[in-house]
Amino acid sequence: MHTLEQLKRGELNGITRLDLAEGLETFPREIFDLADSLEVLNLSGNRLSSLPDDLPRLHRLRILFCSDNAFTTVPAVIGRCARLEMVGFKANRIRTLPGDALPPLLRWLILTDNQLDALPVEIGRCHRLQKLMLAGNRLRELPESLADCQRLELLRIAANQLGALPAWLLRMPRLSWLAFAGNPFSDRMESEILAQHPLPPIDRTQVSFENVLGQGASGIIHRADWQRPGRAGQAMAAKLFKGNLTSDGLPHSEMAASIAAGPHTNLIPVAGPLAEQAGALPGLLMALIDPSFRTLAGPPSLSSCTRDCYPADCRLSAAQVLRIATNVAAVVAHLHARGILHGDLYAHNLLVDPCGQTLLSDFGAASFFDSHSAQAPALQRLEARAYGCLLEELLAHCATVDDDPALRRLAELKRQCLCEAADERPDFTQITRALETICAERTDTAD
């Protein structure tokens, strides 16, 4: 984090990223002294409500963060910033997004946790848009012009006032990661599906919390000891939910999906929800995962936008690739059969052991749907594209693709999943069958 005093003294000349959070109420004019170098401007955590009309003087600016401020409208001047690709106004009081506030090169727009009740039709002009974060607003519908954003891959519309998912949305050629829980049309399904797969609450007096194992946007995971009457203590993990809206959606929907998902070899077992208690955070008690499991990749970066970032030394064998692919397809098919869309099918949500055995985690973007509805096949095929992206990444980190017939077949399955004609993609029942054939043929060849 930088200081305004450093900026005024000229100590920051030549920097490419500026982070200022000092309760600012006006835009410091000294920022323009950085015009020839500044590419990332982070003014989050201030009290700003406007930006200067000459903001385009920052002619190299690519990324602008103004979250946790006092804006009630997205400043129109942003639309005149020729190089701006990423714009973030999370957690303001924004009620209006003017059509002329959309930069021509926009790839990533974050308006989570505001008061928007409509999007401008001009959103359809954002032909480079890949990532649109709108959870926690008041949207009642999506403009049909959004269908013109043919590169859109990730959409977060949870916790709004939407009455339905428009059919055109599910036909978008690259849409792969969708979260829509917490809307009137999905709340009913959430309640119905959860009622079909209940887990009794666990007495909190039986659980003692120990050290923190990790934390994310929705909560904190503790190591825990579960002491049931008449049984030996059992080492577990407990996730305590903060209760706040995240960029993906609402924590109560994550809890509901984690419970409704039920048991599966490739899911982290959930013992049950912690019993409600005054003043206590809601929580889930889960199995403690063997430390041999590691996250497969890191989340997308500012530059990669929608694609995960793998360690530079990541190398996968053919056997690992096939096992990961098979495990993931099996668990997603299981979720879809229960009316759950994972919504965040990414390598950074996969825990993998050295043999390739895989656990799918993080239901923060999960949504509920009627698995017998007319829209169900389209939702399943939407997530098939996310699976195709995962296959593409797995194959890219395997050196033996060209020499292994099974991996060549897997590459063909990847192409089918990435088909831009959404109706022509396989669903996960078809994907799992294809993988069974691929693995069986590989075993026969090895024998």
Task: Give, region by region, the residue ranges found by the protein language model.
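Short beta-strand micro-motifs within the conserved protein kinase catalytic domain, predominantly
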Residues: 269-282
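Catalytic-loop of the protein kinase fold
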Residues: 332, 336-352
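C-lobe/activation-segment region of protein kinase-like
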Residues: 364-416
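Activation segment signature within eukaryotic-like protein kinase domains
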Residues: 324-325
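ATP-binding glycine-rich loop module of kinase domains
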Residues: 220-257
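Structural motif at the C-terminus of the N-lobe alphaC helix and the adjacent alphaC-beta4 loop
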Residues: 256-265
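The feature captures the LRR N-terminal capping module
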Residues: 1-53, 57-112, 118-121, 131, ...
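Conserved short submotifs of the Hanks-type protein kinase catalytic core
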Residues: 279-294
